From Swiss-Prot:
Record-listed E.C. numbers: 6.1.1.6
Organism of this sequence: Shewanella loihica (strain ATCC BAA-1088 / PV-4)
Top-level lineage group: Bacteria
Pfam hit, one: tRNA-synt_2
Protein known as: Lysine--tRNA ligase
InterPro entries membership: Aa-tRNA-synt_II (IPR004364), aa-tRNA-synth_II (IPR006195), aa-tRNA-synth_II/BPL/LPL (IPR045864), Lys-tRNA-ligase_II (IPR002313), Lys-tRNA-ligase_II_N (IPR044136), Lys-tRNA-synth_II_C (IPR018149), NA-bd_OB-fold (IPR012340), NA-bd_OB_tRNA (IPR004365)
Cofactor entry: Mg(2+)
Positions with a binding annotation for Mg(2+) 1: E410, E417
Keywords, alphabetical: Aminoacyl-tRNA synthetase, ATP-binding, Cytoplasm, Ligase, Magnesium, Metal-binding, Nucleotide-binding, Protein biosynthesis
GO terms, biological process: lysyl-tRNA aminoacylation
Class of this enzyme: ligase
Cofactor binding remark: Binds 3 Mg(2+) ions per subunit.
Amino acid sequence: MTEQTQDENKLIAERRAKLDHVRASCPANGHPNNFDRKHKAADIQAEYGQYSKEELEEMNVQRSIAGRIMAKRGPFLVIQDVSGRIQAYAGKDVQKDLKAKYQGLDIGDIIGVTGQLHLSGKGDLYVNMEEYQLLTKALRPLPEKFHGLTDQETRYRQRYVDLIVNEESRAAFIMRSKVVTAIRNFMVSKEFMEVETPMMHSIPGGASARPFITHHNALDIEMYLRIAPELYLKRLVVGGFERVFEINRNFRNEGLSPRHNPEFTMMEFYMAYADYKDLMDLTEEMLSSIAKDLLGDTKLPYGEHTIDFGGPYERLSMLDAIKKYNPDNETIQSMTYEEVKDVEFMRNLAKSLGMTIEKFWTCGQLLEEIFGETAEPKLMQPTFITGYPADISPLARRNDENHFITDRFEFFIGGREVANGFSELNDAEDQDKRFKAQVDAKDAGDDEAMFYDADYITALEHGLPPTAGQGIGIDRLVMLFTNTHTIRDVILFPAMRPQG
């Protein structure tokens, strides 16, 4: 047992003894639930922060606050609630029995205080502790003072402590909530209907990813946590709901990284009688609007960069982006789509760039990997990348002028993908062929290839109107709005390996 652990155990024992003492005299067994908190710290600061000491004395303002003790300095307590902090004061005029109980209060305890509002000599508002009640005794001490946790892993494992002591973490998750609300309000304003589709699928689909597998006991079948809601949302468009969206979780049984968590949040939407260009226009409008609403500006800092959501955003084909960011590579500069269709040419190009390739990769996969290796990290400003090959876009409509590519884009900011959208493939026969090609790819060793979904083909045979659809990664978008660089900082409880 370390010295630090011994000290912590001693503090816990002392706090338990204090709780036992409180329980002996408290009818609620030390955990009362009858305190009426009427006021929040931030509201008090906003309403009375401009008054002088003498003015407050004359006004005789009575306030009732509750929150967690974050500091104890002599007769002063710093109390934190969801809105902010305010002080409480156990001065000379506090009753003797309350004064005695005050000595038993510890940092971390949750208390309720009622009394007159005053201004200290330093200019801080405080509530005189004319009445107070211990509401919850904290048995474990908070980290030293309240400067925050220094160990990142502990912050993720004990998010509740992180939120107590780190204002930055609280602000990030408040911003996350605001971003989600702003997106929802924007979509509703554009006449989209919010829907909910299954989280468990009998056939995984809608994206190229490895699913989580579970078992349904009553039906005695394997089921899959959804990797995307796409195929169900498009079934709804077939059914006549022309504009639908869903904000919910997806699950992909893949690795962890600063950009990836196996459980993540997406906003996916579909609109009939639209194409992928309409989606790009809508995305520009949405992000510009959200930035203005939440930040008051379309520009926001991100690391060493300033991201400008004002638009218009750059639009490049994948092939042109590779050329733009490899200006000194003569082979790339002269590359045409005919060469991109040559798998041996693409393999040799990838190898010349020092890349490790898989034997089952198609021409389209090789092009995407080269893009990801040489161009994607350089896309700091909002950028739409179009011209995705059909063999890596099994659900997207083929381009009318070049059947090798599709009417698809991915949207990048800060060197990472944030959204993916395309004109939907509504040709049931073409979709049937592409599903079969995905099955062949899976048989060849690609465990991220899609399954064949016969019911979805049946839905398409009933007729899907011309439709465009898009998915936006909420977590990655929030990373931009909070200037954070790992997805774990914007997910309240990220996936972690169990301890011990």
